[in-house]
Regions:
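Elongated, amphipathic alpha-helical interaction scaffolds
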Residues: 1-177
Length: 177
């Protein structure tokens, strides 16, 4: 019987699919900003959401590095404009390469307040404060109708604001009228 390697186990176990995923060109102050936008739509609280979004984002960054590594290997076989050093070749990432930022939004379609963790640190077991500077954290970007005010609903340039407001007051018949 042949043993599975760690990479085969990992690739099998972390195959995940986002609800919605788009490449976005955002313009601010006349400058273009490119990013990857993931959307997780929840109607119930997912109590491990910080881990889930961190995993999705990390998988996208790893995918970008992997695509870059293929380009580096291909350029090594062809005439490259700049020689790649051994560290760049091994990592699959040149010193001046850059990743496209990934943002994951969690859209909670429920009138109740999200009572789950909002960051990885909210999920940690108790630990000594002396190690806190060494522990990484990861927060979720949550849109929860119950936590939005009237002025927040107005910020949406589509009917999504109206839908979220409807969700917020769906349990309150008096405010629905």
């Amino acid at each position: 019987m042949q043993k599975e390697g760690a990479s085969e186990i990992m690739s099998r176990e972390i195959e995940r699919f986002r609800d919605i995923y788009k490449y976005v060109d955002v313009r601010t102050d006349g400058k273009a900003v490119y990013l990857m936008l993931g959307l997780e739509v929840q109607d119930k609280v997912h109590y491990a959401m910080p881990v889930r979004t961190m995993l999705y984002d990390a998988m996208e960054y790893a995918s970008q590095v992997q695509k870059n590594a293929k380009l580096i290997k291909k350029s090594g076989r062809e005439k490259a404009e700049r020689k790649v050093d051994s560290g760049e070749f091994l990592s699959g990432f040149r010193k001046d390469d850059r990743l496209i930022p990934v943002i994951t939004l969690v859209l909670y379609l429920n009138p109740d307040i999200w009572d789950g963790p909002r960051s990885l640190s909210d999920m940690y077991a108790p630990y000594d404060d002396a190690i806190k500077p060494y522990i990484n954290d990861y927060k979720i970007n949550l849109i929860s109708p119950a936590e939005l005010g009237h002025e927040d609903f107005m910020k949406f340039h589509t009917d999504l604001g109206k839908v979220l407001e409807f969700i917020k007051f769906s349990d309150d018949k008096g405010k629905m009228e």
